[in-house]
Amino acid sequence: KNIKPRPTKMTIAGKGKKMKFPTLLQPMLATLVDKPFDEEGWLYEVKWDGYRTIALLNSKSTDLLSRNNKSFNEKFYPVYDALKDLKINAVLDGEIIVADEEGLSNFGKLQNWRSEADGELKFYVFDILWLDGYSLMDVTLMERREILISTLPTHPIIHISQTFSTTGTEFFDAAKKMKLEGIMAKKADSLYIPGSRSKEWLKIKAAKRHEVVIGGYTQNEGSPKHFSALLAGVYEKNKLVYTGKIGTGFSEQMQKEMMKKFKPLITKTNPFIFEPDVNKPSRFRPQPPRATVTWLKPKLI
């Protein structure tokens, strides 16, 4: 194999502009469109079904940040450890996923990921924004990708998200056949504008995400809330498969209104094909929440 030489300070300086290491950076977002298209000058990638992540790496620190600048360092520690081992000074943009048995990204498994026993984490990197003291955000996507490919070493957890030279419609049809979430179309000469929703980056969804069904709720010991989390599932071959807990985003008023709807649906029967382990300890919560479960007839979506 031909191994590309790592970019030197001189080659980066010729493309990027000098900039201090950024401690915070909002990702550039894509615009959702309905249909694939065929136009020259676009690069096509897989749309990963995971958590968008900015990785800030230098000799002193490693940080994994969500779209909302929440730290993923503890939550996704295998990715954090892998990036630390790379020993590069760079800012990367990508998506953390859990790969299922077929190698596809599984968002439900990612939401419930606590340790390696819950699935294999991968970090698919699709952009490089800063390297060795230089910002690459004013460099074209095509050039940024060349720098990324020659910067990132091969690693079992860290992967470069491939681009495909084909038409948008062909790639979209292939994505549907492979049961992928969708595709990304990015202008080859697009620059990186942090925090913006760009029309030079487009996302086209192939799989309409399943509507989840509520099969119960939990109440953690000592919690003043009406409920601590909802237990959600999706139907697969007419059986309700548990996909995870939804525990955030409910105001007290919303919880009150939901409890009124839950009341007539309360049942003693677990509606899921397997009983969810609601007290499973995690790395950040080694002590189980001591949650009690109330099952619901699976009528609410």
Model-identified regions with their sequence ranges:
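Catalytic cores of nucleic-acid ligases and guanylyltransferases
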Residues: K1-I301
